[in-house]
Amino acid sequence: GTNETFSSHSEKDYTLSILTAGDGTGAQGDLVSLSGKIAGAGTSSITVTDDTIFGASAKVKLVATILKTSVIQKNKTTKLMKQLKVTSGTTDAYGTRPTDNTISLGRADVFNLVAVFDSEGASTDAIAPEFTVTNQSGTFTRGEKITGATSGATARIINIASPISYILSTSISFVAGETITGESSGASGTIGTLTDGSINITNSYLFDSGQRDNFYDIARLVRKPHSPAPTGRLLVIYDYFEHGAGDMFTVDSYVDIANQMDYEDIPTYSATKVDPETASPAGQFQLRDTYDFRSKVEDIAGTSSILTTIDEITGNSFDFFSRQYDGTGASISDFCKPGSTIQSDLEYYLGKRAAIV
């Protein structure tokens, strides 16, 4: 590819296996040493020659180390307040029914669980609380924080037009007739009629973002031990990242939306495996201080990239076959050779105090 050259030969950097034997001495499955058989190392293409082993018509697989320059940064687009409806009877796939111990969110790299509502009725959809708005000035931003001028209540909004659905951030509730103001947009309006939502059962679940040591898996909710199963349909609301094209994620991959992804909001990853002989890091990785080469699995059937569309998962999420990397939402990255060196430029702020005389 562009800005890629093959490294000089060493046995640990080149692995060639025979997939289909030709008329040479090599058999299917053989691993072939390439010492003295490579021409073109240091360039963008190489030629491997061994007529004795390969003969004619052999098919082989080569895994090689390359040097890549001018690496392209991948972006993570912040998506706020995505809604997922979980109903019974739609599919037999595990993770798609309210009573399943594990609920699939249908996509990877979810960074925040906002709320889970239970309708308490098998034939009724769960809903978030909402209010009508009058005298609106400006346009609210999806996912932003709003504050009530009279009550002091704060919440994050789901939709931006009346009636506005919201998730309270405090134990204080809004009151009719008060003015609300958006923190990010500066939009304002007057609350009219308030409508209660379904029962909030967020505390019944543990949240799994789907991050793994070497890839981004499907995010999920795991019902806590001794928590009762829901009696109705569920509405799950969460924030997630959409992955762009490129080679790796850095601190600059994260873009703020509605004051919900500032520098301090960039997630931390807790490793599933920790080397006890390594003093640092101790299994905690601040992604704002990390080169992240992990690939992301594709979205599960029933998801939509349109943020305002309510998802309803219909496919299998947790079996090995469902971890595909070539469909909608998937993101592939070439991984680095262990122990290799990464060279990059960085900018940082150096504080200084000085006296003016």
Residue spans of the language-model regions?
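Subunit-assembly interface segments of extracellular/virion macromolecular structures
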Residues: 1-357
